[in-house]
Amino acid sequence: MEPRDPSLDALLELDGQVLVVDPAGGHWVRFVVTRVPASPEKPHGLDYSLTLHGPDGERLVGFDNAHTVPTRKRGEALDHRHRLRTVRPYAYRDAGTLLADFWGTVDSVLRERGVIA
């Protein structure tokens, strides 16, 4: 049995949350996180989508495991990240690292767009 991830509860509590991260410009984030049976595609037992959206609703950043990515083989973990128009595999370690990586990427994109300094 794997040790319990102490940051998992924090991630699960974000399910359904929509947070405005730029009230003046309208950027917002959305969290969809649910427990699912562990499988080769979702070995951590989570179905998740963490996204940053622009004022027009366009997804700018996304970390999810909803579909396969071109560089992965069938039956491998589906974890990946979207950054603007680029999709790359993501090496899921634990919920805390997922949240830190997501918020770090959100900050980077908001800086590039001149939303934050």
PLM regions with names:
Residues 32, 63-66, 81, 93-95, ...:
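Surface-exposed loop/turn and secondary-structure junction residues enriched for glycine/proline
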Residues 2-76:
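The feature represents the first ordered module of a protein
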Residues 18, 25, 67-68, 82, ...:
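Low-complexity, compositionally biased segments
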Residues 65-81, 109-117:
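Short, charge- and proline-biased low-complexity linear segments
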Residues 85-115:
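Well-ordered alpha/beta subsegment
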Residues 56-59, 107, 117:
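Alpha-helical membrane insertion/targeting regions
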Residues 46-48, 74-93:
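Short, surface-exposed secondary-structure junctions/capping segments
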